[in-house]
Amino acid sequence: KKTAQKNTATTDKSILDQIIRVDHAGEYGATRIYDGQIAVFGKDSKIGKTIQHMADQEQEHIDKFNELLVEKRVRPTALLPLWNIAGFALGAGTALIGEKSAMACTVAVEKVIGEHYREQQDLLEDDEKELKKTIAKFEKDELEHHDIGIAVSYTHLRAHET
């Protein structure tokens, strides 16, 4: 007796590895940017609390990608030491210029990460439904951060106009 096999598409291992490696690096860089901004603004300032909220979500993202690196046997990028220093420096540097600059950095970074997530969902096949769902949730978080950055910048501009 023959059993019917499901015709389910599988994601190419090299594509899967690339997605996880790139996303892990991006989330790591984002956590370091927020660490740099918080180092300047502090956790207790109004902007610091806003940044901490976004940083907490980014930490959830990096934790998940750390799990996926092990689960899917993917090596992280060799550039993590660079992301560590460059991310913190970018965050601290933009924060030193001011809240508006820090939020402009957030808007730009989160826009790029959100676009990557949208594109990656199209590359994942049926065998990676869970990862696709995770990436869709993270994309939503990144777009929220993008919108927070715009809202804070707009509020900051309006305060200076009056």
Enumerate the language-model features and the residues they cover.
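Active-site flanking loop/helix segments enriched in acidic
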Residues: 12-24
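Acidic/histidine-rich alpha-helical segments that form the ligand environment
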Residues: 23-26, 30, 85-144
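Conserved alpha-helical segments that form or flank metal/cofactor-binding pockets of metalloenzymes
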Residues: 47-82
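Amphipathic alpha-helical coiled-coil segments
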Residues: 64-66, 148-153
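Conserved small/polar residues in nucleotide/adenosyl-binding loops
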Residues: 155-162
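Helix-loop segments that flank and shape redox-cofactor active sites
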Residues: 6-14, 30-52, 71-74, 113-129
